[in-house]
């Protein structure tokens, strides 16, 4: 059994209705902590009821309530729809309209699940907030550090890079040292009906995967057609709206050419999609903005060799980073990398420790 090493405490558990957070609630309850379950209603979940493998749908709220009832712990459902729309959905839509590839789960963790939920937990008199994320919090010489989960297949550190130092002190991640299989065994041991519940696979507010319909609903007439231009300067055809394209995309371009073409750049100002050969996707360096830094401060002229991830599914790559003012950094790969997409996160690691990260800008070369 994993023990948090804390004395008996009042702990709020963010309960999504899935097996991970349910196992956390059961684990902490068995250890004698005063556990309070909170489930956030984040969007109009009616469209997601009955959808398999979606997150935060009506069924999930019901499952969280059933787990809380079985454990005999208080459980609250909080309506965060307006906060979620403002902080996550609107940002998601606007990012696509700017020709970016957004990452709504990071925005949700940053603003709603951590910032707002920690505030609520404190108001309830809780000492800590626990979640079912597969990451580890390790107490270092200079305070709490964020580390990868021990199970590489389930590590979620990429999605939590915007967690602040203050938030990290308050948070607990009991599953960071477990595999998914071990978590399911724990849930079975506690007799939880969600022990075999499938993992969520989709963006929670787009359970059918059709993000374009969400964008068009919130921002009508957002699929304005425009030019497709080869990186060498000649026009190849017409696109159906920049929201339909992302960096590195090959399929669905609707262009006949003598070699495979990929989306290399998206220009939202002039409504142009640039395409080129695979070699045109190669990137040596880029700039990140809104940097959240969890380690010792980097000096202005200092260059630091690190590992970076530019997509959650890609392995870390060696790079050199340097500061550019208070909230920007330059990232330079030691070897070129393909398809660096504006709007995605660049997360910076030293071994298993998350040093920080930021959002990839258009300043790519």
UniProtKB/Swiss-Prot annotation:
GO cellular component: cytoplasm
Binding positions for ATP per the UniProt entry: 14-21, 40, 132
Disulphide-bridged cysteine pairs: 108-204
Signal peptide: none
Annotated localization: Cytoplasm
Pfam families xrefs: tRNA_Me_trans (PF03054), tRNA_Me_trans_C (PF20258), tRNA_Me_trans_M (PF20259)
Site (Interaction with tRNA): 133, 344
One annotated GO biological process: tRNA wobble position uridine thiolation
Catalytic center residues: 108, 204
Annotated keywords: ATP-binding, Cytoplasm, Disulfide bond, Nucleotide-binding, RNA-binding, Transferase, tRNA processing, tRNA-binding
Coiled coil regions, renumbered to chain: none
Positions of region (Interaction with tRNA): 154-156
Family, per entry: Belongs to the MnmA/TRMU family.
Role of this protein: Catalyzes the 2-thiolation of uridine at the wobble position (U34) of tRNA, leading to the formation of s(2)U34.
Name listed for the protein in its UniProt record: tRNA-specific 2-thiouridylase MnmA
Lineage: Bacteria, Pseudomonadati, Pseudomonadota, Alphaproteobacteria, Rickettsiales
Gene: mnmA
